[in-house]
Amino acid sequence: VGKENVYALSGGINWFDSHIDDWIIWLPTTKGFFSPRNLKKVHAYGAETNAHLDIMLGKDWKLDMNGTFSWTPSINESEPMSPADQSVGKQLPYVPEFSATVTGRLSWRTWSLLYKWCYYSQRYTMSSNDYTLTGYLPPYFMNNVTLEKQLSFRWADLSLKGSINNLFDEECLSVLSRPMPGINFEIFIGITPKFGKNKNSKR
């Protein structure tokens, strides 16, 4: 839906349901490295939704917004490996059941400002889904901001980007005992040469 040269709104939803044999999952060990484990049967299913909005704010000004939300259970349906095996019927370790993203890009001529927000639900660290102090990782949010400038020359197109990651210096873990970096900064320079384009334009 939308109005020409004013705004456009679109969206969708997808459902998936997969029964997977011989799923390989990598889990951390006490020695500090990851080791593969084979799961005979995994039931992965869920829904993913997305929405996109474009708004023309005025001459040379444009706002793009995208949002996604995912519900993705991944359940171990293998046979128990032993009488003490409590992993059957449980969510796979380190796989969030819920996740979401929202991005917004404000553009003016060759400048753009990008804001990205991410959410990940709690993740279990054990196949038994024990709700103990070290048995799960709490949910976390992540906020990133990027300023970008496009430059064009005869010989190449340049893209200059400066990013602030983890804008609010959140404490978060993606793997047990391995904290993710706090607020940090990145600079990108992209160069796209225009080989042969000037010669072709003269003909």
Positions of the model-derived regions?
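Residues on the lipid-exposed face of transmembrane beta-strands in outer-membrane beta-barrel proteins
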Residues: 1-3, 47-53, 102-108, 115, ...
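Alpha-helix initiation/capping motif
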Residues: 2, 38-40, 93, 133-136, ...
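Gram-negative outer-membrane beta-barrel transporters
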Residues: 5-20, 37-124
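Extended alpha-helical regions
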Residues: 16, 20-27, 42, 169-172, ...
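Outer-membrane beta-barrel translocator domains and adjoining extracellular loop/strand segments
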Residues: 23-32, 76-85, 116-117, 124-132, ...
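Generic detector of contiguous secondary-structure segments
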Residues: 29-40, 99-102, 127-135
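Short, solvent-exposed coil/turn segments
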Residues: 32, 44, 65, 97, ...
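C-terminal beta-signal and adjacent terminal beta-strands/loops
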Residues: 118-128, 136-141, 147-203
